[in-house]
Design a protein with these regions (language model features):
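A general structural motif
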Residues: 9-11, 38-42, 65-69, 87-89, ...
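Structural motif
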Residues: 14-20, 44-52, 70-78, 91-100, ...
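Non-catalytic interaction/Regulatory regions outside core domains
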Residues: 96-101, 106-150, 257-266
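A C-terminal junction/extension of Radical SAM enzymes
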Residues: 128-199, 245
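Residue-level structural signal for beta-strand termini and adjacent loop
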Residues: 202-204
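Flexible mid-to-C-terminal extensions adjoining Fe-S/redox cofactors in radical SAM and related proteins
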Residues: 206-266
């Protein structure tokens, strides 16, 4: 297996959890050593503390060739308190309930993208107003299921027939939906202990970085995996005329415990 396997690999997310100092650098060294010869587009690192952020900035200074694909992901509290400012590509995660009453730090920072997590209609309205107020361009609104807000999901996430036809669906998209999962394909998640998951953190590990190289794990997922190639080929979707027009199965189906998230019965 040569570097061809890396053509399928689009993004690696590394959750460094409680790692600090040398242990953190060792994990990053191992990940980067294995993917540097490929064409990885995104190496996303989930950061929890200011000391981790400083360690990673030093690590990146010593690995300039990684600059083009490395991006940070952190909660708003850490980002807002970063005394150095954010100059690297970064995604800030913010719960709707944590939106500051005053100005939104980094609102004008072109390096920053946003993930706003919402649980209710009111939170969705608050976030939408914030986006309009600051004219944010790079953002994602992420509904969070908490076992009590199914009506919110039924209203805002579940599909109607009109949603499917709200924009043109190309033949390429239809064919893609028949063979791969567009939400999960090409994505790996690496835990601080080296466990590697394909497509989602909810999936079982497909191996461990310290025991198997990433190229082999990509091959395993392509030939044996159940995440990247998870399509709508089960009931009731397999009996629906809109089977390949709908988006691929997502984590929401797994969390909510339903094979489909729609109001369509055809």
């Amino acid at each position: 297996m040569g570097t061809k396997m890396f053509t399928y690999l689009y993004k690696i997310t590394v959750d460094i959890e409680e790692l600090e100092g040398e242990a953190l650098c060792a994990l990053m060294d191992e990940v980067w050593e294995q993917v540097r010869s490929g064409s990885l587009k995104h190496l996303c690192i989930i950061i929890y503390t200011a000391s981790q952020l400083q360690t990673l900035r030093t690590w990146l200074e010593n690995h300039e060739e990684a600059t083009g694909c490395v991006e940070w992901m952190m909660k708003a509290e850490l980002a807002f308190n970063d005394r150095h400012g954010i100059n690297e590509p970064a995604t800030i995660i913010m719960n709707a309930e944590d939106i500051p009453a005053g100005n939104l730090p980094h609102a004008g920072n072109s390096s920053v993208s946003w993930i706003f997590r919402v649980h209710t209609e009111d939170e969705l309205e608050t976030v939408s107003s914030l986006i309009d107020r600051y004219e944010l361009q790079h953002y994602k609104i992420e509904p969070v299921y908490d076992n009590t807000n199914l009506p919110f999901f039924e209203e805002q996430v579940f599909l109607e027939k009109e949603d499917i036809f709200s924009k043109p669906v190309s033949m390429q998209e239809i064919m893609r939906n028949q063979v791969l999962n567009t939400h999960k394909f090409g994505k790996l998640f690496v835990s601080s202990n080296g466990d590697v998951r394909a497509g989602s953190v909810l999936e079982a590990p497909i191996g461990n970085l310290h025991a198997e190289n990433i190229r082999r794990l990509v091959h395993k997922e392509m030939t044996e995996g159940k995440s990247w190639l998870h399509i709508r080929n089960q009931k009731p979707c397999c009996d629906c005329i809109y089977q390949w027009l709908c988006p691929s199965p997502s984590d929401y189906e797994s969390v909510i415990g339903r094979p489909n998230l729609c109001h369509i019965e055809e």
